[in-house]
Amino acid sequence: MADVAKLCDELLALTILEAKELNDLLEEKGIKAAAAVAVAGPAGGGDAPAAEEKDEFDVVLTGAGDKKINVIKEVRAITGLGLKEAKDLVEGAPKAVKEAASKTEAEEIKAKLEAAGASVELK
């Protein structure tokens, strides 16, 4: 067991160049790095894996509706864009208003835009 721990410490101490050389030597011996990834799969029953919940969302404005001016004002407040940029974003729908927002932030932005009369999607 001590030999394995020592080997582990030595592997962790390798520089990137040394790790690349080790990888090349292992490939010459027929051991591919991708093979280890293919072997590691979900264990157990035949059930489909549970869908992972996203933690980042893009808030996409899909339409301005009848109250375009209110939507432009809300887009300006959310993004900090100037009047022309906000107007171009609203008129160029579908466009992302906010990218990589947290779930709560994305839902708040969606609620604000929908209250202003816009149609919004979270992606």
From Swiss-Prot:
One of its GO terms (biological process) is translation. Coiled coil: none annotated. GO terms for cellular component: cytosolic large ribosomal subunit. Disulfide bonds: none annotated. One of its GO terms (molecular function) is mRNA binding. Gene3D superfamilies: 3.30.1390.10, Single helix bin (1.20.5.710). The keyword Ribosomal protein applies. The keyword Ribonucleoprotein applies. Pfam families: Ribosomal_L12, Ribosomal_L12_N. Keywords: Ribonucleoprotein, Ribosomal protein. It comes from the Bacteria. Homodimer. Part of the ribosomal stalk of the 50S ribosomal subunit. Forms a multimeric L10(L12)X complex, where L10 forms an elongated spine to which 2 to 4 L12 dimers bind in a sequential fashion. Binds GTP-bound translation factors. PANTHER family: 39S RIBOSOMAL PROTEIN L12, LARGE RIBOSOMAL SUBUNIT PROTEIN BL12M. Belongs to the bacterial ribosomal protein bL12 family. Forms part of the ribosomal stalk which helps the ribosome interact with GTP-bound translation factors. Is thus essential for accurate translation. This is Large ribosomal subunit protein bL12. The gene is rplL.
